[in-house]
Amino acid sequence: MAKVVSRIVKLQIESGSAKPSPPVGPAIGQAGIPIMAFCKAFNAATEGMEKGIPIPTTVTCYKDKSFTFTMSQPPVSFFLKKEVGIKSGSKLPGKESCGSITRENIRKIAQLKMQDMGAIDIEGAMRMVEGSACSMGISVVD
């Protein structure tokens, strides 16, 4: 017999640092699954990754108090900030630039994110990444 899904929780957790404190604890606890069991499983799954990378995670909670989770690639904004070397995007995107990125770097990010994006080809994924860069105030150079 298939397990009955009780809730699906979407979180963005930094790799290797899932703790029972907010925001992870309350979101997982309300779903009725053991918080420490999830934290240990998530930290074990992200053990080989660099610390502090934001990981979009979807936790599927079942009626019998068990759970499964899937992790995606970090957001495009994380990759853009890492490539440009900035802490945050521009406060006035379109008016002031906070850095620049090359098309080769955009292609590299698009290839990493291709599986999570709804793009059909690499050019479409590159346009999505360029749009994210533009909305963050990062200029794209050739």
From Swiss-Prot:
InterPro entries attached to this UniProt entry: Ribosomal_uL11, Ribosomal_uL11_bac-typ, Ribosomal_uL11_C, Ribosomal_uL11_C_sf, Ribosomal_uL11_CS, Ribosomal_uL11_N, Ribosomal_uL11_N_sf
Alphabetically ordered keywords of this record? Methylation, Ribonucleoprotein, Ribosomal protein, RNA-binding, rRNA-binding
According to the record, the segments passing through the membrane are none
Report the superkingdom from the record.
Bacteria
According to its UniProt entry, the protein's GO biological process terms are:
translation
Any single GO molecular-function term of the entry would be:
structural constituent of ribosome
Q: How is it modified after translation?
A: One or more lysine residues are methylated.
Q: Which GO terms describe its cellular component?
A: cytosolic large ribosomal subunit
Report the function annotation for this chain. Answer: Forms part of the ribosomal stalk which helps the ribosome interact with GTP-bound translation factors.
Complex and partners: Part of the ribosomal stalk of the 50S ribosomal subunit. Interacts with L10 and the large rRNA to form the base of the stalk. L10 forms an elongated spine to which L12 dimers bind in a sequential fashion forming a multimeric L10(L12)X complex.
Q: Which family does it belong to?
A: Belongs to the universal ribosomal protein uL11 family.
Q: What NCBIfam families does UniProt report for this protein, alphabetically?
A: L11_bact
In its UniProt entry, what is this protein called? Answer: Large ribosomal subunit protein uL11
Which organism is this entry from?
A: Liberibacter asiaticus (Citrus greening disease)
